[in-house]
A protein has these predicted regions:
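Hydrophobic (often cysteine-bearing) scaffold residues that line and stabilize catalytic clefts
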Residues: 30, 34, 89, 93, ...
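Active-site-proximal loop and beta-strand segments within enzyme catalytic domains
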Residues: 50-54, 62, 76-196
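Short beta-strand scaffold segments in enzyme catalytic cores
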Residues: 57-60, 317, 340
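Structured C-terminal helix/loop/strand segments within mature extracytoplasmic catalytic/sensor domains
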Residues: 331-380
Length: 380
């Protein structure tokens, strides 16, 4: 049996329905059910033969209340995981990049090459020089919106790396941008393709726009800190490569690390955080502290169509249900696998969140575990 680490944060909420809003109770029995589900997930012998990750940290929120946050297993040799353990969060970074881009538009920043106010429909021709290959008569114009919704049709560089750069080595962001300018859109116009290219480019858009608007410092990392991290009250969230500090989960690799060097994953997968900070992020986003109502509506709108009932919004996958909508994203970078999801009830202010962080790559089933934890929170 795995050692269960840290302290559960248990809030007892009355079951009630007031003014159409639902509140859910959280009890010691529910906390025990969570422990049982996670212990089963982390069991050493799995039917598919997959090894469990050494550590898992989670946070569960109900209507903006943190009802459970704790860690399981070993963050590193001799150190138990907790809700404060810091992990690389991989593609959960895209949620922050999307919010920062929407915030920049709200602030009235202007496009560098035209001087027009930034908008979702601003074309890349108004931001970058030398992107003529991105815009041909046969292809729709690549815009901020098409990057956010992954419908730009630009190839995903982590699937097909540019020929002149080494996926196992470092690459400066300006050089990678120059290589991406040589690409041409492919595929059915406006079709969805999961794309780290899009979110790397969004980070470059933020920097280019801020530099042209004489913002100081222009770095997209500094802007995300000021516009998102600080506003959400996140104290252990930052970027890969910075001074790590205490409490980091040691990574466990199941494959040779690629795209792990700077600046491959800028904007798409270069952030670190912990479970309680990501709950704080979910809460700040859902309560309007990061972006305004219209931007939030755009973020959670049906963007690129992924499947019959699944879309990609802006930094989140969107699944429409009969009673609840699910906004979610997974993350997978060398040494870490993560998952963050928000469950929003139709025609109600009620929402739930589940965050799961692990310190091994190639981990499967976090989405299914999150579904089980949502069922516990809803009393199902």
């Amino acid at each position: 049996m795995h050692v269960l680490a840290s302290i559960a944060v248990i809030a007892i909420l009355e079951i009630s329905r007031i003014g159409g809003a639902w509140a859910f109770d959280w009890t010691a029995e529910k906390a025990a059910r969570v422990d049982a589900l996670v212990s089963h997930y982390l069991r050493p012998q799995r039917l598919n033969g997959e090894r469990p990750p050494p550590a898992l940290s989670l946070a569960i929120g109900v209507d903006g209340n943190l009802v459970l946050a704790k860690g399981y297993g070993q963050a590193s040799a001799g150190t138990q995981a907790s809700e404060h353990t810091v992990y690389h969060i991989g593609s959960l970074t895209k949620q922050f990049t999307a919010a920062a881009m929407l915030r920049l538009i709200e602030e009235g920043a202007r496009a560098p090459l035209t001087g027009a106010p930034m908008a979702l429909e601003t074309p890349m021709l108004a931001i970058f020089e030398g992107v003529e290959r991105w815009n041909t008569p046969e292809e729709p114009t690549i815009t901020v919106r098409s990057l956010l919704t992954m419908t730009s049709n630009l190839p995903n560089f982590t699937r097909r790396p540019p020929p002149n750069v080494d996926p196992w080595g470092a690459v400066p962001a300006p050089r990678l941008l120059d290589e991406l300018k040589k690409l041409s859109p492919t595929g059915w116009p406006h079709s969805f393709e999961y794309s780290n290219t899009s979110y790397f480019l969004l980070a470059q858009v933020i920097e280019t726009v801020r530099r042209a608007n004489h913002a100081s410092p222009p770095s997209y990392r500094d802007y995300i800190r000021a516009a998102v991290i600080d506003k959400a009250g996140m104290t252990r969230t930052g970027f890969v490569g910075e001074q790590p500090g205490p409490g980091y989960a040691r990574p466990h690799y199941r494959r040779r690390p690629a795209f792990a060097q700077p600046d491959w994953l800028n904007g798409s997968g270069d952030m670190v955080s912990n479970a309680v900070d990501l709950f704080a992020w979910n809460k700040a986003l859902m309560t309007g502290r990061i972006i305004g109502p219209e931007s939030l509506k755009a973020m959670f709108a049906d963007g690129g169509r992924v499947g019959p009932v699944t879309y990609y919004g802006m930094g989140w996958f969107i699944d429409r249900g009969s009673t609840w909508d699910v906004f979610s994203h997974s993350g997978s970078v060398p040494g870490y696998t993560t998952y963050n999801a928000i469950l929003k009830r139709h025609n109600s202010a009620s929402w739930l969140s589940v965050t799961l962080l692990t310190n091994a790559d190639g981990v499967e089933g976090l989405d299914a575990l999150a579904d089980d934890l949502f069922d516990v929170a809803r009393g199902e």
